[in-house]
């Protein structure tokens, strides 16, 4: 062989073919000047999955945009095409929203951070203020950089649970009215967006309007996971919302919440995707499901005609221990590489 021929069905295919070509060059040759030798092969392949993603939680641990650029480079090398950017959670709000400046000034920061696991008591904290957020210019740069690598960016704005950071800045959107202190540890808080207040939906619609303008991809992730119903059960406004809409329980109230968000985003030409808890109480008509608690939720959603992304935590979460428990601190669990490969 004395030549290289690449055929592809489009620009993305050509890009992926180049990644394959680069992988055929031995690492020891890349630093050498002049010609290099590569194996004489014929490769014919295509993606197995439409959505080939990587998720980065920047709420609990903030990463500068330069890190994200390097991560996108690595994703492109592995022919991944979707960057799931987890921008909000209990521990921090990481995206600038012009209409709500307190999200950057207050919600992006916590007083300190838990050292170790939440199950290890008494809790010990580091005493260091922690936080940060991405400006709209930062977001634009990330989205444009990703696009050059044929990577779509899916922002995640958590609702109705995992909302403490937002409620820290705007406590009037909680069921109790606040104050809602910073969430400095891991786990799940009972403080969630109040489903009985119209102000909650006005706030989220304002946020999502700006988010939709920043992210051109068709999907926006709305979270939907791990939403305790304790506050809703005790909240007169949430119970009135339930009664007025003939909802039999708080799971259906969450479904009402998600469906309102879906309708709002659909009017802006966007689709929603959420964690598999959005199946509880009745799934929104056009929602896609990201199944993290195992395979069953994804299978259920697929059988109902919904698009599904499989993300079962026991197989694909990267914040688990990989071999011995004397590794650097992880959230828990044990996930050796061989188990990751066994997911099929």
Feature locations, PLM:
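Feature activates predominantly on carbohydrate-active enzymes
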Residues: 1-219, 235, 260, 264
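Flexible loop/turn segments at secondary-structure boundaries
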Residues: 62-64, 90-96, 160-166, 221, ...
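Substrate-binding groove of N-acetylhexosamine-processing glycoside hydrolases
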Residues: 141, 197-219, 226, 240-344
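Conserved, charged catalytic cores of large soluble enzymes
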Residues: 232, 236-240
